[in-house]
From Swiss-Prot:
Family: Belongs to the CbiM family.
Principal cellular location given in the protein's record: membrane
Transmembrane segments: 31-51, 68-88, 100-120, 132-152, 160-180, 206-226
Originating species: Moorella thermoacetica (strain ATCC 39073 / JCM 9320)
Subunit structure: Forms an energy-coupling factor (ECF) transporter complex composed of an ATP-binding protein (A component, CbiO), a transmembrane protein (T component, CbiQ) and 2 possible substrate-capture proteins (S components, CbiM and CbiN) of unknown stoichimetry.
Name recorded for this polypeptide: Cobalt transport protein CbiM
Amino acid sequence: MFRRTTWLTLYLLLAMAALARPAFAMHIAEGFLPFNWAAFWFIVVLPFWIWGLRSIRHTVKSNPGLKMLLGLAGAYTFVLSALKLPSVTGSCSHPTGIGLGAVLFGPAAMSILGGIVLLFQALLLAHGGLSTLGANTFSMAVVGPFVAYGLYRLVRKLKGSMPLAVFLAATLGDLMTYVTTSLQLALAFPAQAGGVVASMLKFMGIFAVTQLPLAISEGFLTVIVFNLLATYNKNDLEELSIMPGKTAAEGGPSRQYSR
């Protein structure tokens, strides 16, 4: 039953993505960054891609049944980050969708899933670009997931509820993606008066009006999706050690996953 529901969910998510129209959004556009900065961000994300590949390979090898959930996390990221809403100055803002995957599989796996999502969007939706793939991956698929996963673990360690942990992870992971993108643009294009700081504040201000409510909405949506997974796919969440289950001595999973 769950697999049938998951396939239907994936189909609907991809159908929604196909209807998304290209627009200038917060992803840095093709050719916008100078060559030296574009190359710099590729070098920065390369170790995360290597780590992410190892993490995904280990997870899938340990439990092949998690492939469907991994695909769902990627589809969720693809669709949410492709839903562009009008912002000021004729640009667009959009959710990122990285919080769910970060909570489920950790930040390493999301560096790969997010990178694949950004590559497809650059090729199919004219969203972002190939030359700026490194920069966009660092902001949305590295910083965002690390912040999301770190907050999730912190809230859970402080005995916070699961819905609160997921909400904060998705919301602040989204916001930090845009803070990072603003910093990347500011480093490449510092203001004549005020330098990098002034330029960063300017870029952040452009998107703040729409991005804050979008991030909060993404937080609530991610909680809803997580609750559905907890209801209809509890076994996989137990395998990932997200929800309590039987220990290995009791016949449960060993839970040795690289996150």
